[in-house]
Amino acid sequence: MGLMNAFDSQTEDSSPAIGRNLRSRPLARKKLSEMVEEELEQMIRRREFGEGEQLPSERELMAFFNVGRPSVREALAALKRKGLVQINNGERARVSRPSADTIIGELSGMAKDFLSHPGGIAHFEQLRLFFESSLVRYAAEHATDEQIDLLAKALEINSQSLDNNAAFIRSDVDFHRVLAEIPGNPIFMAIHVALLDWLIAARPTVTDQALHEHNNVSYQQHIAIVDAIRRHDPDEADRALQSHLNSVSATWHAFGQTTNKKK
């Protein structure tokens, strides 16, 4: 029996004993593209197509599943969003391994929508505080001399960028990225990058002078964090980090209040 015929041959038990209080309503049928997507995903997960291997051509998939080209293309696009295939112009889809970035990226739309709701930014800032608090404690306990040197280099770039707001923001993100790299967990890195991207995108536009004052405060707080990590003092590193992020949160909240009053 062909694949699509197998889908179509499924029967439903019409016994009245099922859910006496349920109202009669038709069940939504899956789109052909969703059925093709699910079958291809299972084939990939069963290693019928290995990592780096190309899938059959669109024409071959159309014949195999007995569907049209749009259904095949929609299915492949969905697999690409999941990180299961790569699609380059003029080439057949190639099986790939989902990365932590792919997994977190799937949440991006929902996260940005959540940030736009009342209290959304505060919730994400709290998440960042809990997350980075664990990172600095780990760094203070386990960071190698080489990793501490990388933090010091990031701090130096931070210092050199104080008079350039755009450069300072980049160096600020890089400083916290080095912290996230210390445990060596790619999921931590993906979460950290996404969190900062989402929060920075939600920040209001402020004057260069206001940002310059904020940059100097942040830089001094970064120094305190690195000093505590260098002394391998997790409690002090945690206190310095929490003081820093609470200050950042309060500052950007004040910026937002000022911006709203001017509107």
UniProtKB/Swiss-Prot annotation:
Keywords in UniProt for this one? DNA-binding, Repressor, Transcription, Transcription regulation
Q: Where is the HTH gntR-type domain?
A: 30-98
| KW DNA-binding (keyword) present | yes
Single GO biological process annotation from the record: positive regulation of protein-containing complex assembly
Q: Which domain of life is it from?
A: Bacteria
Q: Which residues bind DNA?
A: 58-77
- GO molecular function ontology, one term from the record: DNA-binding transcription repressor activity
PROSITE patterns in the cross-refs: HTH_GNTR
User: Has UniProt tagged this entry with the keyword Zinc?
Assistant: no
Annotated region (Disordered) at 1-22
Summarize subunit and interaction data from the UniProt record for this chain.
Homodimer. Might also form higher-order oligomers.
Sequence similarity: Belongs to the NanR family.
Protein's name in the database: HTH-type transcriptional repressor NanR
Lineage runs: Bacteria, Pseudomonadati, Pseudomonadota, Gammaproteobacteria, Enterobacterales
Q: Which gene encodes it?
A: nanR
